[in-house]
UniProtKB/Swiss-Prot annotation:
Membership in a protein family: Belongs to the IRC22 family.
Regions crossing the membrane: 161-181
Top-level taxonomy: Eukaryota, Fungi, Dikarya, Ascomycota, Saccharomycotina
Alphabetical UniProt keywords: Endoplasmic reticulum, Membrane, Signal, Transmembrane, Transmembrane helix
Protein name, per record: Increased recombination centers protein 22
Length: 239
């Protein structure tokens, strides 16, 4: 039978509810075991693989081998560094029951743990609070090694697509604004200027009887040329 060493300090919130305090270490004959509901195949000798944002459920089974009744009143825990055993973060205390367990009997309850830590290797050490012999006692459970990683984001994730659309719209707006302020003026200033050809027109006073009509592609006035020069000579073909 496994005997656990009890920690001396009790949580203030739980002590207030029950009305007892502990001053020194105690020894009790209580067996506590748990398994991970989502991955029951993971044992204490394995390394669990967790992702930030997931919720892990621990199902506890407690066997009371004491001669008196014990009452489970809460559960907490901590993530520690498996190499240095330093505490990295504490879990939020959760109320249980109170769940009374008579001598020689067992009981079960569950604890939900939200995973939100810096990606790394950890050891999860749950702790169960219970009342025994008019004292609040804490039993640290076995540790569970775990590797925590960030959740991978898919390229087709709606949140990522929305962010991409917002960025594209922002870049398009900035580009359009820059064109209106600087680009448009720059293009107008550097574009080649097309020169239009003009034809000189000679003005003639009205009433002079002079016509300035030109013909075809000759480009000269035919009114002053004698008619004889304008007629084409006809030649007869002699047989």
């Amino acid at each position: 039978m496994k005997v656990f060493t009890l920690l001396a300090a009790a949580a203030a919130s739980i002590a207030t509810v029950v009305g007892y305090e502990t001053a020194e270490k105690q020894f009790v004959d209580i067996l506590i075991e748990y398994q991970i509901v989502q991955t029951p195949e993971v044992t204490k000798n394995d390394v669990a693989q967790w992702t930030n944002g997931d919720e892990v459920t621990l199902k506890y089974n407690i066997v009371n081998n004491e001669e008196k009744e014990v009452t489970v009143i809460g559960v907490t825990g901590q993530f520690t560094n498996p190499v240095t055993n330093e505490i990295v973060t504490n879990l939020t205390q959760g109320r249980v029951g109170p769940l009374s367990i008579p001598p020689g009997q067992s009981a079960s309850f569950e604890q939900n743990i939200g995973i939100d830590v810096i990606p790394n290797n950890y050891e999860l050490i749950p702790q169960v609070f219970f009342a025994h012999d008019e004292l609040i006692k804490v039993i640290p459970c076995r540790g569970q090694l775990a590797t925590v990683a960030d959740k991978s984001i898919s390229f087709f994730d709606p949140r990522l697509i929305f962010l991409e659309l917002v960025l594209l719209a922002s870049f398009a707006g900035i580009a359009y604004l820059a064109y209106q302020i600087w680009g448009k003026k720059y293009i107008q200033g550097t574009a080649p200027v097309k020169v239009k050809k003009t034809t000189a027109v000679t003005s003639v006073p009205a009433g002079t009887g002079v016509s300035t009509t030109t013909t075809g592609a000759s480009g000269y006035d035919v009114n002053w040329i004698p008619e004889g020069h304008l007629k084409q000579k006809k030649t007869k073909k002699v047989a």
